[in-house]
Amino acid sequence: MASVMSNNNNNNNNNNASYMFTNPLSNTGGGLINEIKDAINEMEQLKVLELKQICKSLDLSITGKKAVLQDRIKQFLRKSCDIGHIDPWRPKAIKILIAKVRINSSLPKYSTLWETLKTGAFKHPVASGQLPVTALQSTALPPYSQQQALAYSFTSPFYKPIVQIPDANKKLKQSAGRGCTKMKFKVSKSNHDLLKSNKSYKLYLFSGFSIPFIYETVGHEAIDFPYPCELVFNGTKLEDNVKGLKKQNGTGNPANLTPYLKVPTEMNHLDLHYLNIDKEYSISCFIVEVFSPEALLGKILKRPKIIKQATTAYIKRTLNEQDDDDIITTSTVLSLQCPISCTRMKYPAKTDQCKHIQCFDALWFLHSQSQVPTWQCPICQHPIKFDQLKISEFVDNIIQNCNEDVEQVEISVDGSWKPIHNSSAVITDTVNQNHSVKNENQGTVKQEQDYDSRNAFDTNLRNGSNHNEPEIISLDSSDDEAFIPASKSFPTHVNPRNDQLRADIFPSESEGSSDYNPNHTSTPKGSPTMDQDNYQDAFQMRSFLNQGATTNINDTPTNNSSINSFVTATNGDSRIFYNRGPSTPLLPAVLQNLTNQTEAQRNPYGPNYNTTAQDRNLLGIEGDLPPIPPVDPNSEAETELPTRTTSAAHLPPYIHVSTSGHGDDGKIRKRRHSNVSIYIPKNPYATLMKRRPQANHAIMNKTLAQTNDFNTSAQDNSEVVDLTSD
């Protein structure tokens, strides 16, 4: 008789393998004392934070050290054996709480869980029916049935189980090292025919934590594979993204076995390699129906929408709460762009639990969840479920009645709205929005902000257009980067520094262009001309070589100045660019005249060379400077530059150009500057750059910058101004 019972128990244990999850409440044969000991042993492996969560569920104090918390739970468990108060459900409930806290799952109240176990309302995670009380005291589980498999479901709405494959189930024990689980199974002909009957039917391998679940979450299991792991099915390594995000449960995806499935008469082999798993996993194969994001979107569209009145009431309540004694909030801004795709929303959705009016595109959200199922709101990061997603009637009405180019709308307290145009104008100086510049030759010019020109700017720059270009101050380059010219047009006597760089930046240029001639073999070097006929309204900041010097284009040296920035001036607004990304208005268009002054002042021989009378007048300079002193390339003596007193009070405080030159040994010495600062000497004529020519004439001809460039003392006559400071 005993042998028969033993055989029956063995058969029942084998039947347990056909379930994705076994019932941990079945191990009660050792009596209540053994259950209490097992619960205590499992409890002692928990961390302090986990112990506090258990105590909170038990309505015990959560203060004290780890040993104190453990003693409280031990005493609570030992009360199960009090005389006259035998409680067999207490250790069972504690085990469930321990299992749930190990996977960072929310814990129910102990009293609720205890009542559920006592009344038999606790459900097996696979079976759909309720387990009777007697089932909790037995080691046997109900036999496998297809109806039970059909009742099983996952938290992911993309998969609906149809049939669970027999013998394709395994449990992965905790492992401190490498491990491998092998599984062999056949798929019957009827299941093969089922897969062929519908294209949406697939054979998938699922994995999840082998833990008990209470009635609140029964029938809904998150997909989790060991991390890291590797799957090999019938000799093929599966590339499916089953691992998900590290340390984020429920972000994995099942593995698709359908393409590698063998015929019904052959055995399928599955190998799962894993490393260092601290929890038990159960893996199982299901034939499931796969739903596409578009199919799920159809379900969302059939649901009732979040009514407009609820949204307007929230807007009114929120704006009124933000009011204080000094500031009254009258409106808020709503973006019509999806935060996931950064494109115009078509199906604005959110949940009733989200405390914001901003929505996201439902279809884009479903596509993202099909890849990495985090199931968090992309705006507030709160957990959401598929069944909670709804279309916002208020936002949907705005999208339907707005032009395609509108990206934001302004919403008033009463729920009315109006489109916001030119939404790229995020930062602007209101003082400079309508700034009048007195220009001696051109009269009075009214400067107006034109933020819609951000797209036209790149086009005009590449096409060499000098009209309506925004002013640019590039502050993202380092000392070692090559100089990027601001204008496509170069005067015939100014040689581009780097033809390859210009070809990369301005692909529209070609060798046949009238503005670009790569065959300058003996072009005089010097400061760029300020003649309006050549440069019109665009000017570049750069360091300069000697007037009248010559060099071959192939020997053109790189810029040794640490400016690595350029400024162009137009009648448009000014913008600052970071990494050639989106532009932000920063400086006024009055920078045009300031650029002229800067160019003239940086000329080592004074502003009279290649400058207009207007520039000299702006600088307060009358007449011409002395002629250029002769340059002896074999002389080690420093040639003093002609100086001229002038007033620098008209220069703005934020235009300061830091320069670096050469030491006495002729080597380049660079000075690094802030990414948000531009420098220029306070009095450039008092300590302007001095040449340090090399004695070696051959070196001079080859590396002109190292022989004829200039050195400025930044410590004596320059100051640093941070544009980000007040």
Swiss-Prot record:
Heme among keywords: no
Positions of region (Disordered): 507-533
Gene Ontology cellular component terms for the protein in this record: chromatin; cytoplasm; nucleus
Post-translational modification: Autosumoylated upon ethanol stress.
UniProt pathway: Protein modification; protein sumoylation
GO BP terms, alphabetized: chromosome segregation; DNA double-strand break attachment to nuclear envelope; protein sumoylation
InterPro entries: PINIT, PINIT_sf, SAP_dom, SAP_dom_sf, SIZ1/2_SP-RING, Znf_MIZ, Znf_RING/FYVE/PHD
Misc remark: Present with 3170 molecules/cell in log phase SD medium.
Protein name, entry field: E3 SUMO-protein ligase SIZ2
Organism this protein belongs to: Saccharomyces cerevisiae (strain ATCC 204508 / S288c) (Baker's yeast)
